[in-house]
From Swiss-Prot:
Name under which the protein is recorded: Uncharacterized protein MJ0596
Stored InterPro entries: DUF2666
Pfam families reported for this sequence: DUF2666
């Protein structure tokens, strides 16, 4: 069997195919780019398939921190993280689900929402890898 990566999904109106045939000319960074793209696709889709009120989760996120223009101070970041991990936030998650595992799922999603609003990336972007590849190639010329 040839070396390759294939990701295919079809469910209702959602259809995605991401493929890469790997040979001796394929660079590891190209594999990383595809894997990051698959990761982005999957992680963006997961909330749609969960049985929770995601609008309510975004309301909770808005109560913790709403993205604003300008630089965020370390004190603001500390305060936001304190709110994020507070018992009050956990109680609000109880309004969405009482399941311990459900709350763990929602906390993970909420953490990502808040960290991204703070400008803290929680995963590798395929677009950034693409720019890295472009810049690496142009600097090697």
């Amino acid at each position: 069997m040839e070396d390759k990566i294939e990701f295919m999904a079809k469910h209702k109106k959602w259809f995605v195919v991401k493929k890469l045939k790997i040979d001796e000319n394929t660079e590891d960074i190209e594999i990383a780019r595809l894997l990051a793209s698959i990761d982005e696709t999957v992680l963006n889709k997961i909330p749609e398939y969960l049985p929770f009120d995601m609008n309510k989760l975004y309301e909770i996120a808005d109560g913790i921190y709403q993205k604003k223009k300008g630089r965020i101070t370390e004190e603001e970041i500390a305060e936001v993280l304190k709110k994020l991990k507070s018992p009050a936030t956990t109680r609000k998650l109880n309004e969405i689900t009482e399941s311990k595992e459900g709350k763990e799922i929602l906390k993970a999603i909420l953490n990502n929402i808040i960290l991204e609003r703070l400008g803290i990336q929680t995963r590798v972007s395929p677009k950034v890898i693409e720019k890295y590849i472009e810049n690496s190639q142009s600097s090697n010329r």
